[in-house]
């Protein structure tokens, strides 16, 4: 397929819209590389994969593809022995998580019997590396930061580091609390300069604290000093930070080495996930356009029902039926230049490119489109200023190139064929070019405003005329395509509507030859009759649709009634059973106690009475109630006919009858697949309206149950408050009436912060310090509402 044609028909704009539905750069890249296929089997497969994606979207609403990243460059670095940073490792882990989720997601669909031959096979290729995924999950977070859980050594280093930092802060805070602080310090804050904790000291008091000056303010009035008392602690902190960095590098190198053993598997998983993203993007794009999967023809047959141009406003675009390849292989659309004829050409051409690219098309169900080896288009003014060619020469150069390449598997779209030269010669050339195109076996749709070509559709058995309807009242085209009706001149009617004198119009009519006038009158009459027939057909179809809907609604209500009845009976039975089981358990306990009393010598308790009471209790259990099976209303046996909608019982799939092979067998179209099916395996159905899918989301808790106490000792202030917030949620979910928060005694800063936070928590009823046995004021007891 020529790139030039893709540009003329604006296929690049379709691809740009399609990229908006991709979830990753991998999906976007696949879309950018998308091109129409010409092999019929390939087109079938790409259409089927899109249909399977659409089926999944209908059933589940979405697929777990979020989090997919292009990691091919990371894998290349591993291949040459390099190490990855934390973010790169996280991205590989994210892809492994998406691989596992996608495989489980697909397995769930396949287990409930959803037919997904292509996507099912694709998911089978995904390899789940759960251990590798989990190792990454406990080692790095989504920002690429290495977690404390990555190694015991790192956890110990960071714990020691936090304690050291707390000691530094506590020492510096003592300076801030000093009674002379307001006099000697510019501000009562602890800050950091050169990665060391400092306090802002006024210039005149710099000798009071000793230590090291790390910075000064712009005015020079404030010095940022590290007091001598914390120099050693800060040095210790720096040493711990160096150890932390060293341990992080070791962890990243270790994980990189372990990932290097799985390069091929991760590479393949990422490629497969990119395919999934691309396929789901096609499916979501089709859903947004209200598009359908077309039937495919390998014989040049096109039958588009209510086809719409996908780049025009969906609320305003006029849908048209376009058919070609059965009764005729050439359509000549005649009429004035303002009639929207070019839109018809572009609609057919663009929908062909979309279908051959595996995309659904904006048309109605049961539309058929042909798979062509070549699509040629001579549309618009492609005049080349560099070559100094005229409009006519430019078009003719293009047409010559087309006729050299065309074959019987080609679709040619000619816009204003023969224009740009003398009308008589132009019309003659147009006829000759159409004949030459037909002789090559091509399917052709051409537009022209030459009246001489109106006769072409009548004089050639392989051709038909068409036109775009024009509304004389509004002086504008309706953009409705009328196949079989040639375009007519509206000059006299338009002139009259615009106020031209009737005398002038009458004189003009007299100058037109009788044959032309009669032809225009005939075309006008034909248009009126066609419009009337279409109106009556639509009304009849609407009435039939209404009757079908009434029948379906009635059958649905009957089914719902019986289902509701059975559900209520089942609920009542289950409730009764629960009550009896509870009573039975209580009775068993009483009987057990009575037997104990009997053994201990109690009088008046007889064994046979206990057995009899237990038997009566067992008989009190409700019996299973048989569900009502609703019987479908009896209908007269249906005589199958071509075009009937049917259900293939053995497959559980819907299809359409194509033709009868024998009394016992039919050819059935199921999606894009044609199959031979036994008549006994068919059930007649009416097409149903698409039902809105209700998406049910289940939320499951995971992880270990919350403990009844939270130990914050050794935690930094900010980290501690975050842990308290998370812990309270977990404790509430676990149902604890009260919990203990251990913060230690220390300076009281952490205790004060925790207390203030708890006072403002909406689920906390009361707080108190622990009793002596509970830990004293180093523990806060929290009671929930």
UniProtKB/Swiss-Prot annotation:
InterPro entries referenced in this protein's UniProt entry, alphabetically: DNA_mismatch_repair_MutS_C (IPR000432), DNA_mismatch_repair_MutS_core (IPR007696), DNA_mismatch_repair_MutS_sf (IPR036187), MSSS (IPR046893), MutS (IPR045076), MutS2 (IPR005747), P-loop_NTPase (IPR027417), Smr_dom (IPR002625)
Annotated keywords: ATP-binding, DNA-binding, Endonuclease, Hydrolase, Nuclease, Nucleotide-binding, RNA-binding, rRNA-binding
SUPFAM superfamilies reported for this sequence: DNA repair protein MutS, domain III (SSF48334), P-loop containing nucleoside triphosphate hydrolases (SSF52540), SMR domain-like (SSF160443)
Pfam families noted in UniProt: MSSS (PF20297), MutS_V (PF00488), Smr (PF01713)
Listed GO MF terms: ATP binding; ATP hydrolysis activity; ATP-dependent DNA damage sensor activity; double-stranded DNA binding; endonuclease activity; mismatched DNA binding; ribosomal large subunit binding; rRNA binding
Binding annotation for ATP: 335-342
The EC number(s) this enzyme carries: 3.1.-.-, 3.6.4.-
Domain of life assignment: Bacteria
GO biological process: mismatch repair; negative regulation of DNA recombination; rescue of stalled ribosome
Domain Smr stretches: 710-785
Biological role: Endonuclease that is involved in the suppression of homologous recombination and thus may have a key role in the control of bacterial genetic diversity.
Assembly behavior: Homodimer. Binds to stalled ribosomes, contacting rRNA.
Family membership noted in the UniProt record: Belongs to the DNA mismatch repair MutS family. MutS2 subfamily.
HAMAP family in the cross-refs: MutS2
Descriptive protein name: Endonuclease MutS2
Organism name: Listeria monocytogenes serovar 1/2a (strain ATCC BAA-679 / EGD-e)
Lineage of the species this protein comes from: Bacteria, Bacillati, Bacillota, Bacilli, Bacillales
Protein encoded by which gene: mutS2
